[in-house]
Amino acid sequence: MAFSPSLFQPLVIQKETHGGEPSSPNHVIACIPLTGYVAALVVNACFYPLLFCLPYSSCRASVCKTLVLYVLMLYNFILSCILVEDTQQPVGICLMVYCIILMAIWTIDRVRFCLLIRSLRPLIDMRSNFIRVNTVAGGVVIPVNYSKPWFVKNFNQRCRCTNCFFAHSATYLECTFISRFSKTTLVSISDFQLNGSHSTVFVPFNSRDSVPLHIIAPSVLTV
């Protein structure tokens, strides 16, 4: 209902002429009804909380958030086109400029990530930190929820997609942490076992920073 263009059809208001007054040209005023703006605000108000409240618990949830962002940008762009074509050109132009700038910044950022990690995954996943693992057969890129350059293999794996399962189970030659402004090679420093599962901690090579194992690993473990 909020997406219907009929809500944004301008209303034409004509000046009434009284019987005793001389006839004169009617003054026509065109305006978009309030329901159109209310519908647009309601849609945006519903999408933005959904965009920021969905968790990053899995790759599927992140893809859903990215699709919601695309739908929101498309909705606002179509709305701005409708406003520009009708009578609300200042409002429509401002909204269109906002949408174009937002889409340009998003596209540049995502294309840069695609070139950096040599994968199209950033186009459908809005996260900005990735782990790339290379094996003899090839490489796999998985997005991660944290921004620190470390990785714990086969531990607390929430996502069960093919790429995440491979990265947490395969034996690989190289592990790289890729963020927006850096690319860091990770090396294994410690192994531990928990509930019969063997996990490996990867940190940057020659790193002087301490690794908070109390955050990424439980307090009771066997090293």
Swiss-Prot record:
Disulfide bonds: none
Name of this chain's protein: Non-structural protein 3d
Domain (CoV 3a-like viroporin CD): residue spans on this chain: 129-186
InterPro entries: a/bCoV_VIROPORIN_3A-like_CD, a/bCoV_VIROPORIN_3A-like_TM, MERS-CoV-like_ORF5
Chief site of localization: host cell
Keyword set includes Membrane: yes
Membrane topology: Multi-pass membrane protein
Keyword vocabulary terms for this entry: Host membrane, Membrane, Transmembrane, Transmembrane helix
Ranges for domain CoV 3a-like viroporin TM: 22-125
Ranges that cross the membrane: 32-52, 63-83, 88-108
Compartments (UniProt record): Host membrane
PROSITE patterns membership: COV_VIROPORIN_3A_CD (PS51967), COV_VIROPORIN_3A_TM (PS51966)
Keyword Magnesium assigned: no
Organism superkingdom: Viruses
Any Gene Ontology CC annotation: host cell membrane
